[in-house]
């Protein structure tokens, strides 16, 4: 009920228009550009090491029902509207065929039976990848290089849970799932240039193209990046396996190599078989109806991908 009231209050609200195609905090971005990667990593770890990541009572796992998927998508829509790159729609969520594909896994962070964070792993398919709409040539080049591709998308965290390690734990679950269960070799992501330094210097993503405006997201700027998952563990070990780069998770000391590649966390619950939740035709149609989308508005290719044709 509270969510419905919030949606109706904000329904139709135009995104905040940021000067030009987007607002970049030039001073911050310019400063980060000149920070050496090793120093950037030390500063980042120092910041998160101030407090132990408190994940007690949290659960991080793939969605298990259509209700959970839709709650995650509502959280994404709220987050995008708050950032000014989308409007709040009547349903509180926007339809995307990518989230219903057999190769897509949507992860959620759950606390007190509420979904407070989400991120999705979208594997390459007959529909391609979402970032191809803006960075088509870059994705084609990655395909030509061979290997299994997937895109990281729709990261969102509820307002009261930012700064508590929720994104790191979601990424932990998603990385392990992609590497060990789905055989993904390269992760692609499109981020705002403001976040580029974090992904390059901390998670070792590499730029694969130029910054472009993302038309569907109020012309927000989009930087395409790629991470070679096959080499990531060795890179993380070399960069992070040292005492000066440690931090705590629930009072236990760790570092990013151990955190992402070795330690197991009971709060992260991944299906042992590596199977992805498949949505049947009735669930797909139900979700479309809730989003105000009719089957006749979908292309034949999308209908085939969703097993509706």
Regions found by a protein language model. Name each.
Residues 1-19:
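Intrinsically disordered, low-structural-confidence terminal and linker regions
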Residues 91-98, 211-215:
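Short, solvent-exposed loop/turn elements at beta->coil junctions and helix N-caps
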Residues 108-142:
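Short, His- and charge-rich active-site/binding loops that engage polyanionic ligands
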Residues 129-232:
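Acyl-donor binding region in acyl/amide transferases
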Residues 281-309:
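C-terminal non-catalytic accessory extensions
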